[in-house]
Regions:
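C-terminal accessory "lid"/substrate-recognition subdomains
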Residues: 15, 32-45, 138-157
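Structural motif
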Residues: 54-58, 82-84, 106-110, 127-130
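Conserved nucleotide-sensing/catalytic segment adjacent to the nucleotide-binding pocket
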Residues: 76-119
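C-terminal effector modules of nucleic-acid-centric enzymes and ribosome-associated factors
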Residues: 1-57, 66-69, 73
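Hydrophobic positions on the alpha1 helix immediately C-terminal to the Walker A/P-loop
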Residues: 63
Length: 157
């Protein structure tokens, strides 16, 4: 149908060239249907999980912030959620989970007992794999892997 040449405006050099053989006239594009959990997981390179941290002598906000920092540096999309008393924790978790986020939930024992709908992507046994920041982050990273590929250091390509 025709040829094209792309020229860089700054350097005035040829950036690309090609041949158009046919025109796609279909009405739908790359994503057919709605953007759902699977699409978000594929784009982010991670599966949404909620990791429950119950406050104790060892587990405090600083500890969870350190875990979040390690995960964030590794390219995970994280959110540290420390709800105040009276918040609808289950509703907030539902929305964060739909968004494809790794949620680090810092709660006291009473709040932990009040949470409904703990799904298969709700992790409470993280301490069985160690209690050091790096060990916990490695366990969460493993649990939030999308498919077979593990994204590290923001390397999505």
């Amino acid at each position: 149908m025709g040829e094209f040449i792309l020229i860089d405006r700054v350097t005035n050099m040829t950036s690309a060239c090609g041949v158009v053989e046919n025109v796609n006239t279909e009405e739908h594009g790359l994503y057919e249907g709605r953007v759902d959990r699977k699409v978000r997981a594929a784009v982010k390179g991670q599966t949404a999980v909620t990791v429950e941290f119950v406050k104790s002598d060892k587990v405090n906000r600083a500890f969870v912030e350190d875990v979040e920092k390690v995960l964030h540096i590794d390219g995970r999309h994280t959110y540290l959620y420390a709800p105040s008393q009276g918040e609808d924790i289950s509703l907030v978790l539902k929305h964060l989970h739909r968004a494809g986020i790794v949620v680090l939930l810092l709660v006291d024992k009473k709040q932990a007992d009040s949470i409904e709908n703990k799904t298969e992507n709700y992790i409470t046994n993280w301490s069985e794999n160690g209690t050091e920041v790096e060990e916990v982050a490695a366990y969460i990273r493993k649990q939030s892997v999308y498919g077979e590929a593990s994204v590290r250091n923001g390397n999505y390509i």
